[in-house]
Amino acid sequence: MDSQGPIILEKSIKIEEVIKIANTSIIDIVTKTVTPEIKAPYELVDVEYDKMGSDYILSILVDKEDGITVEDTSDLTNIISPLLDTIDPDPFPNQYMLEVSSPGLERPLKTADSLKAAVGSYINVSLYQAIDKVKVFQGDLLAFDGETLTIDYLDKTRHKIVNIPYQAVAKVRMAVKL
């Protein structure tokens, strides 16, 4: 503060943006810490850090080929929890609850490899910007070559094919076909 009062910044940042940036770095730190310790047959699917009500939840989603059991999540929690306590400096601004679980039926597809493995599956794709006035596509993933997703989706009553550039994709997850 100078003698004329507080300095007002010309560009304001929304608190949601600050929280998102902080959560991203927490997710990156946790991912780098736990990835080397989650060994076959397990696969780290995703790390999420969110506020639910007044609580913060650190969710570590893990899977294996024949599915995760309650015993698996207990064993993994016993491996992961002490690892998180060793991170220095502590990246968590608040107390949090650790949740180790299966990604479920609508698991996120975060990597090119997971997308390649999902060819033939029914998926949900959210885009950064709309293609033909559509920002979310849900349909069968026909192909993925590392650069383009090809999806067969239903537009009202007609099947259509769309090619989506991989860099245009904000989120992809498995979807349940009803």
Swiss-Prot record:
First-listed, main subcellular location of the protein, grouped into a coarse class: cytoplasm
Keywords: Cytoplasm, Ribosome biogenesis
Cited InterPro entries: Ribosome_maturation_RimP, RimP_C, RimP_C_sf, RimP_N, RimP_N_sf
Highest taxon in the source lineage: Bacteria
GO biological process, one term: translation
GO CC annotation terms, alphabetical: cytosol
Gene3D superfamilies: Ribosome maturation factor RimP, C-terminal domain, RimP-like superfamily, N-terminal
Compartments it resides in: Cytoplasm
Pfam families in the cross-refs: DUF150_C, RimP_N
Similarity remark: Belongs to the RimP family.
Record-linked NCBIfam families: PRK00092.1-2
Cited function: Required for maturation of 30S ribosomal subunits.
Protein name according to UniProt: Ribosome maturation factor RimP
